[in-house]
Amino acid sequence: MRVSIADALGRASARLSEAGCDTPRLDAELLLAEALGVDRERLVLDAAEPLGEGASERFDALLARRAAREPVAYILGRKEFRRITLAVDPRVLIPRPETERLVEVGLTVPPGARVIDVGTGSGAVALALKHERPDLTVLGVDLSADALEVARANAARLGLDVDFVLGDLLNGVEGPVDGVLANLPYVAEGVGLAPEISRYEPPAALFGGPDGLDVIRRLVAMAKGVPVIAMEVGLPQAVSTLLERAGFESIEVLRDLADHERVVVARG
Protein backbone atom coordinates (compact mmCIF):
# COMPACT_ATOMS: atom_id res chain seq x y z
CA MET A 1 0.00 0.00 0.00
CA ARG A 2 1.35 3.37 -1.00
CA VAL A 3 1.73 5.99 1.71
CA SER A 4 0.41 9.51 1.41
CA ILE A 5 2.62 12.52 0.95
CA ALA A 6 1.81 13.59 4.52
CA ASP A 7 2.80 10.21 5.95
CA ALA A 8 5.97 10.10 3.88
CA LEU A 9 6.96 13.50 5.21
CA GLY A 10 6.27 12.46 8.78
CA ARG A 11 8.42 9.35 8.50
CA ALA A 12 11.19 11.21 6.72
CA SER A 13 11.23 13.96 9.34
CA ALA A 14 11.57 11.38 12.11
CA ARG A 15 14.42 9.66 10.27
CA LEU A 16 16.33 12.89 9.76
CA SER A 17 15.75 13.93 13.35
CA GLU A 18 17.25 10.65 14.54
CA ALA A 19 20.22 11.26 12.24
CA GLY A 20 20.88 14.56 14.04
CA CYS A 21 19.77 17.01 11.35
CA ASP A 22 18.90 20.46 12.72
CA THR A 23 15.87 21.11 10.52
CA PRO A 24 14.43 17.67 9.75
CA ARG A 25 10.96 18.76 8.63
CA LEU A 26 12.22 21.49 6.33
CA ASP A 27 14.84 19.18 4.88
CA ALA A 28 12.26 16.46 4.27
CA GLU A 29 9.95 18.91 2.50
CA LEU A 30 12.71 20.24 0.27
CA LEU A 31 13.83 16.76 -0.71
CA LEU A 32 10.32 15.45 -1.34
CA ALA A 33 9.51 18.49 -3.47
CA GLU A 34 12.67 17.74 -5.44
CA ALA A 35 11.71 14.08 -5.86
CA LEU A 36 8.26 15.07 -7.10
CA GLY A 37 9.45 17.99 -9.21
CA VAL A 38 7.05 20.42 -7.51
CA ASP A 39 7.21 23.47 -5.24
CA ARG A 40 7.07 22.93 -1.48
CA GLU A 41 3.66 24.60 -1.36
CA ARG A 42 2.28 21.77 -3.46
CA LEU A 43 3.04 19.28 -0.70
CA VAL A 44 0.38 20.90 1.48
CA LEU A 45 -2.23 20.92 -1.26
CA ASP A 46 -1.54 17.29 -2.17
CA ALA A 47 -0.89 16.02 1.37
CA ALA A 48 -3.49 13.24 1.12
CA GLU A 49 -2.34 12.06 -2.30
CA PRO A 50 -0.41 8.77 -2.49
CA LEU A 51 3.29 8.94 -3.21
CA GLY A 52 4.04 7.17 -6.48
CA GLU A 53 6.59 4.37 -6.66
CA GLY A 54 9.08 6.31 -8.77
CA ALA A 55 8.90 9.38 -6.56
CA SER A 56 9.19 7.20 -3.48
CA GLU A 57 12.42 5.66 -4.75
CA ARG A 58 13.85 9.07 -5.63
CA PHE A 59 12.86 10.41 -2.22
CA ASP A 60 14.48 7.48 -0.41
CA ALA A 61 17.73 8.04 -2.29
CA LEU A 62 17.77 11.73 -1.39
CA LEU A 63 16.90 10.98 2.23
CA ALA A 64 19.77 8.52 2.53
CA ARG A 65 22.19 11.23 1.50
CA ARG A 66 20.76 13.71 3.99
CA ALA A 67 20.74 11.11 6.77
CA ALA A 68 24.48 10.77 6.11
CA ARG A 69 24.57 14.52 6.89
CA GLU A 70 25.26 15.66 3.32
CA PRO A 71 24.04 19.28 3.11
CA VAL A 72 20.71 19.83 1.38
CA ALA A 73 22.30 22.42 -0.91
CA TYR A 74 24.74 19.86 -2.28
CA ILE A 75 21.99 17.26 -2.68
CA LEU A 76 19.83 19.70 -4.63
CA GLY A 77 22.81 21.27 -6.38
CA ARG A 78 21.64 24.79 -5.70
CA LYS A 79 21.30 27.46 -3.02
CA GLU A 80 19.31 30.68 -2.87
CA PHE A 81 21.31 33.78 -1.99
CA ARG A 82 19.58 37.15 -1.76
CA ARG A 83 17.72 37.46 -5.07
CA ILE A 84 19.59 34.83 -7.08
CA THR A 85 19.90 31.05 -7.11
CA LEU A 86 23.40 29.61 -7.37
CA ALA A 87 24.60 26.20 -8.46
CA VAL A 88 26.76 24.69 -5.72
CA ASP A 89 28.74 21.50 -5.21
CA PRO A 90 31.54 20.35 -2.89
CA ARG A 91 34.08 22.44 -4.81
CA VAL A 92 32.68 25.54 -3.11
CA LEU A 93 31.44 26.64 0.28
CA ILE A 94 27.66 26.81 0.55
CA PRO A 95 26.54 30.47 0.62
CA ARG A 96 25.05 31.41 3.98
CA PRO A 97 22.56 34.10 5.00
CA GLU A 98 25.13 35.92 7.15
CA THR A 99 27.30 36.47 4.09
CA GLU A 100 24.55 38.61 2.58
CA ARG A 101 25.78 41.38 4.88
CA LEU A 102 28.82 41.73 2.63
CA VAL A 103 26.52 42.45 -0.30
CA GLU A 104 24.73 45.09 1.75
CA VAL A 105 28.03 46.88 2.28
CA GLY A 106 28.81 46.62 -1.43
CA LEU A 107 25.52 48.28 -2.26
CA THR A 108 26.72 51.47 -0.51
CA VAL A 109 29.68 52.19 -2.79
CA PRO A 110 29.47 55.13 -5.24
CA PRO A 111 28.01 54.71 -8.74
CA GLY A 112 30.38 53.10 -11.21
CA ALA A 113 32.76 51.87 -8.52
CA ARG A 114 34.99 48.81 -8.96
CA VAL A 115 34.54 46.19 -6.25
CA ILE A 116 36.66 43.08 -5.67
CA ASP A 117 35.12 39.95 -4.13
CA VAL A 118 38.09 38.15 -2.58
CA GLY A 119 37.62 34.43 -2.00
CA THR A 120 34.62 34.43 -4.29
CA GLY A 121 33.91 30.68 -4.19
CA SER A 122 30.61 30.09 -5.98
CA GLY A 123 30.54 33.78 -6.92
CA ALA A 124 27.71 34.45 -4.49
CA VAL A 125 28.75 37.90 -3.28
CA ALA A 126 30.04 39.13 -6.64
CA LEU A 127 26.99 37.95 -8.57
CA ALA A 128 24.41 39.13 -6.03
CA LEU A 129 26.06 42.55 -5.98
CA LYS A 130 26.16 42.83 -9.77
CA HIS A 131 22.54 41.68 -9.96
CA GLU A 132 21.44 44.50 -7.65
CA ARG A 133 23.96 47.13 -8.80
CA PRO A 134 24.53 46.65 -12.54
CA ASP A 135 26.39 49.97 -12.67
CA LEU A 136 29.30 48.49 -10.72
CA THR A 137 32.35 46.74 -12.11
CA VAL A 138 32.74 43.56 -10.06
CA LEU A 139 35.70 41.18 -10.07
CA GLY A 140 35.78 37.85 -8.24
CA VAL A 141 39.12 36.38 -7.14
CA ASP A 142 39.84 32.91 -5.80
CA LEU A 143 42.84 30.69 -5.24
CA SER A 144 40.86 27.62 -6.33
CA ALA A 145 40.51 26.91 -10.04
CA ASP A 146 37.71 24.46 -9.22
CA ALA A 147 35.76 27.16 -7.40
CA LEU A 148 36.18 29.54 -10.32
CA GLU A 149 34.64 26.97 -12.66
CA VAL A 150 31.53 27.03 -10.49
CA ALA A 151 31.51 30.83 -10.28
CA ARG A 152 31.88 31.32 -14.03
CA ALA A 153 29.12 28.82 -14.73
CA ASN A 154 26.85 30.68 -12.33
CA ALA A 155 27.63 34.00 -14.01
CA ALA A 156 26.88 32.56 -17.44
CA ARG A 157 23.61 30.99 -16.32
CA LEU A 158 22.49 34.20 -14.61
CA GLY A 159 23.62 36.39 -17.50
CA LEU A 160 25.71 38.63 -15.25
CA ASP A 161 28.83 40.41 -16.50
CA VAL A 162 31.30 39.57 -13.74
CA ASP A 163 34.91 38.58 -14.39
CA PHE A 164 36.58 35.90 -12.30
CA VAL A 165 40.33 35.48 -12.00
CA LEU A 166 42.63 32.97 -10.36
CA GLY A 167 44.69 34.73 -7.73
CA ASP A 168 45.92 34.95 -4.17
CA LEU A 169 43.87 37.66 -2.45
CA LEU A 170 44.70 41.00 -4.15
CA ASN A 171 47.93 39.82 -5.79
CA GLY A 172 47.62 40.35 -9.51
CA VAL A 173 44.57 42.62 -9.28
CA GLU A 174 45.32 45.58 -11.52
CA GLY A 175 43.56 48.90 -11.80
CA PRO A 176 41.52 50.89 -9.29
CA VAL A 177 39.97 49.19 -6.27
CA ASP A 178 37.08 51.11 -4.72
CA GLY A 179 35.94 48.37 -2.38
CA VAL A 180 36.91 44.91 -1.16
CA LEU A 181 34.43 42.32 0.07
CA ALA A 182 35.83 39.11 1.53
CA ASN A 183 34.54 35.90 3.04
CA LEU A 184 37.87 34.25 3.75
CA PRO A 185 38.73 31.15 5.80
CA TYR A 186 38.33 32.22 9.43
CA VAL A 187 37.78 29.01 11.43
CA ALA A 188 40.66 28.20 13.78
CA GLU A 189 42.35 24.85 13.24
CA GLY A 190 41.06 22.15 15.56
CA VAL A 191 37.63 23.69 16.06
CA GLY A 192 34.87 21.08 15.93
CA LEU A 193 32.33 21.57 13.17
CA ALA A 194 29.02 19.95 12.29
CA PRO A 195 29.28 16.87 10.05
CA GLU A 196 27.63 18.78 7.20
CA ILE A 197 30.64 21.08 7.22
CA SER A 198 33.52 18.85 8.29
CA ARG A 199 32.66 15.96 5.96
CA TYR A 200 31.53 17.80 2.86
CA GLU A 201 32.62 21.44 2.54
CA PRO A 202 36.11 22.31 1.22
CA PRO A 203 38.57 22.66 4.15
CA ALA A 204 40.63 25.28 2.30
CA ALA A 205 37.61 27.59 2.37
CA LEU A 206 37.11 27.12 6.11
CA PHE A 207 40.32 27.01 8.12
CA GLY A 208 42.49 30.08 8.62
CA GLY A 209 45.39 28.80 10.69
CA PRO A 210 45.84 28.34 14.46
CA ASP A 211 43.72 31.38 15.37
CA GLY A 212 41.70 31.64 12.16
CA LEU A 213 43.34 34.93 11.19
CA ASP A 214 46.21 33.89 8.90
CA VAL A 215 44.51 34.78 5.61
CA ILE A 216 42.74 37.82 7.02
CA ARG A 217 46.04 39.28 8.25
CA ARG A 218 47.48 39.02 4.75
CA LEU A 219 44.47 40.69 3.15
CA VAL A 220 44.48 43.57 5.64
CA ALA A 221 48.14 44.23 4.84
CA MET A 222 47.37 44.29 1.11
CA ALA A 223 44.27 46.45 1.38
CA LYS A 224 45.88 49.58 2.83
CA GLY A 225 44.49 52.60 1.02
CA VAL A 226 41.31 50.87 -0.19
CA PRO A 227 38.32 53.17 0.49
CA VAL A 228 36.21 50.41 2.05
CA ILE A 229 36.81 46.81 3.04
CA ALA A 230 34.25 44.43 4.54
CA MET A 231 35.08 40.96 5.83
CA GLU A 232 33.02 38.17 7.32
CA VAL A 233 34.92 37.06 10.42
CA GLY A 234 34.85 34.91 13.51
CA LEU A 235 36.85 37.24 15.79
CA PRO A 236 35.51 40.74 15.09
CA GLN A 237 37.46 42.53 17.80
CA ALA A 238 40.77 41.01 16.77
CA VAL A 239 40.11 41.89 13.12
CA SER A 240 39.09 45.42 14.08
CA THR A 241 42.44 45.82 15.84
CA LEU A 242 44.30 44.59 12.75
CA LEU A 243 42.47 47.13 10.60
CA GLU A 244 43.11 49.96 13.03
CA ARG A 245 46.82 49.18 13.06
CA ALA A 246 46.77 49.16 9.26
CA GLY A 247 45.55 52.75 9.24
CA PHE A 248 41.81 52.37 8.74
CA GLU A 249 39.98 55.04 10.72
CA SER A 250 36.26 54.26 10.58
CA ILE A 251 35.62 50.69 11.74
CA GLU A 252 32.25 49.14 12.57
CA VAL A 253 30.99 45.64 13.28
CA LEU A 254 27.70 44.44 11.78
CA ARG A 255 25.53 41.72 13.28
CA ASP A 256 24.01 38.87 11.30
CA LEU A 257 20.42 37.60 11.46
CA ALA A 258 21.31 35.50 14.51
CA ASP A 259 22.55 38.67 16.25
CA HIS A 260 26.18 37.55 16.13
CA GLU A 261 28.90 40.08 15.34
CA ARG A 262 29.84 38.80 11.91
CA VAL A 263 31.08 41.44 9.47
CA VAL A 264 33.76 44.05 10.07
CA VAL A 265 33.63 47.13 7.84
CA ALA A 266 36.52 49.58 7.65
CA ARG A 267 36.90 52.76 5.67
CA GLY A 268 40.18 54.44 4.91
Model-derived regions, located:
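Conserved Class I SAM-dependent methyltransferase catalytic core
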Residues: 210-266
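Conserved AdoMet
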Residues: 30-105
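Conserved hydrophobic residues forming the short capping helix/wall of the S-adenosyl-L-methionine
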Residues: 16, 155, 243
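Conserved SAM/SAH cofactor-binding pocket of Class I
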Residues: 94-194, 235
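Conserved beta-strand segments of alpha/beta enzyme cores
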Residues: 85, 137, 161-163, 249-252
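Non-catalytic accessory regions of SAM-dependent methyltransferases
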Residues: 1-44, 51
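Residue-level signal for inorganic ion chemistry
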Residues: 31, 69, 99, 125, ...
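Mobile active-site "lid"/loop adjacent to the S-adenosyl-L-methionine
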Residues: 184-215
